[in-house]
């Protein structure tokens, strides 16, 4: 579960290392975001000469959470960290060209096929 002020790892090669959630998108008063939800983030740490810089405000999709996701068969998939992939504000496509670490099949339902195709492992 991701809420405001949660620090997330950035799981792409856009140049950002860490991002902080500043708003959970999708309805007024919505408090938590899970895997596949779109959030608004502020970049907290970035590498030099990157596509994004510290202080940028962007949209991102949550790809991994410590809370995990429950499947219909009763299994739960949990991760060691909270991670997101930065999105372009205009067309909701990823800014980076590579995705680091595994992602879940639930992103396919949310119309993020580009992230699924770039990911090295889909659980």
Curated annotation (Swiss-Prot):
GO molecular function ontology, one term from the record: large ribosomal subunit rRNA binding
Pfam families in the cross-refs: Ribosomal_L14
Domain of life according to the entry: Bacteria
Alphabetical keyword list: Ribonucleoprotein, Ribosomal protein, RNA-binding, rRNA-binding
GO CC annotations on file: cytosolic large ribosomal subunit
Gene3D superfamilies, sorted: Ribosomal protein L14
CDD domains assigned to the protein according to its UniProt record, in alphabetical order: Ribosomal_uL14 (cd00337)
InterPro entries: Ribosomal_uL14, Ribosomal_uL14_bac-type, Ribosomal_uL14_CS, Ribosomal_uL14_sf
Family in the record: Belongs to the universal ribosomal protein uL14 family.
Assembly description: Part of the 50S ribosomal subunit. Forms a cluster with proteins L3 and L19. In the 70S ribosome, L14 and L19 interact and together make contacts with the 16S rRNA in bridges B5 and B8.
Role this protein plays: Binds to 23S rRNA. Forms part of two intersubunit bridges in the 70S ribosome.
NCBIfam families: rplN_bact
Name of the protein: Large ribosomal subunit protein uL14
